């Protein structure tokens, strides 16, 4: 399969997911705190090459791939490559430099469920959302429990 076709398939999947994510958000009103980028600084977040294929292809088409390879080779921190902190002092606040091309993990975090060790669905979110949006977090858990997390 040609690379263009793979990129189109990933982008089509992301478009469908965005519809479902927006539906979940409209039911729960859950969202990341404005400017929070704490998860973008965690070195143990797993992401696959496939979920960043559209971004890599975008870099290639815009003659930025070589420059990015050099940047990656000289990188000294473990932040997500797309993350741009607002401050050198507190790297936990910032934003995605290319939101359209963010990975699947970035799209789903806080807006999806995963199975716990008992096989039960649980809201996949962070401590910051749990503490700052307690009522909404409870609502999100309720939506998941009642299967109100998928578009019909």
Regions found by a protein language model. Give the residues of each.
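Short loop/turn segments that flank or connect secondary-structure elements
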Residues: 1-38, 42, 46-152
């Amino acid at each position: 399969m040609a690379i263009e076709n793979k990129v189109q398939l990933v982008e089509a999947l992301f478009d469908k997911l965005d519809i479902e994510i927006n539906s979940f958000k409209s039911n729960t009103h859950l969202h990341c705190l404005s400017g929070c980028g704490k998860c973008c600084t965690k070195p143990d977040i797993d992401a696959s090459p496939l979920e960043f294929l559209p971004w890599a292809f975008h870099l290639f088409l815009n003659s930025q791939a070589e420059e990015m390879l050099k940047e990656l080779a000289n990188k000294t921190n473990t932040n997500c490559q797309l993350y741009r902190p607002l401050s050198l002092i507190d790297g936990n606040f910032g934003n995605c430099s290319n939101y359209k091309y963010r990975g699947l993990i970035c799209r789903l975090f806080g807006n999806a469920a995963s199975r716990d060790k008992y096989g039960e669905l649980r809201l996949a979110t962070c401590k910051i959302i749990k503490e700052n949006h307690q009522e909404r977090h409870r609502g999100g858990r309720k939506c998941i429990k009642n299967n109100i997390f998928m578009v019909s």
